[in-house]
């Protein structure tokens, strides 16, 4: 294991920010700590980075050197790319050679004399990553790396950062409030709410097999509370899913018929609220339909 945490808690006065956190991260794994504002995710990251002390902890063990990549990259705007990276190598005897290796590895050799405000967001991310790993870290901590970015840039930077992390064979922990970031980047997701970990699973397990508490908070999930006739094939499937299923688990087909109650245009999809017998639920479809129209649908077998 790269990181193991057992029974970690953190209090700020009478406020308990983290409660009995148990977490493990394997070497080479990418873990996202997912949660909303006030969930405790940033506090947990700061404790792992040793920027904050836990109020109590049975043990916290990290196998290798830790580096942190901050939300705004924390690059020095008055220094050029080369000097930003050299800042992390101030006490290294072979810092010139390490610098050359990093510039080549991250494909930023042509940027070495440019200042930070002269390069793109993607290039700045590469520089920040190069500086973070300059001292030979084994565990990289990422603090909301994609917040405040437009959607196109965010998608590009996610792909780029994931590729770089895999290439460097580094273990990474990212805190984020954006579930799309977590689904896209992660091997595992720890879902944090009000200082407690509600779920620790791979992205598909979290979406397709969430527990009830997680499903109440996670987006794009239907929770069915009505009594169902389990002789009905669709209702039997819902029961097999513990009465929780995703909007994207249904498609147009010929097995079941529902009536459209509401629709919202989301760009690539329409979010439809439909009624089937005695239950209402949501589904995502690419085609447009009219209100009160009947549609035939089926279950997607993932």
Task: Report residues per predicted region.
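ABC ATPase nucleotide-binding domains
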Residues: 67, 80-206, 210
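Non-catalytic connector elements of ABC transporters
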Residues: 231-302
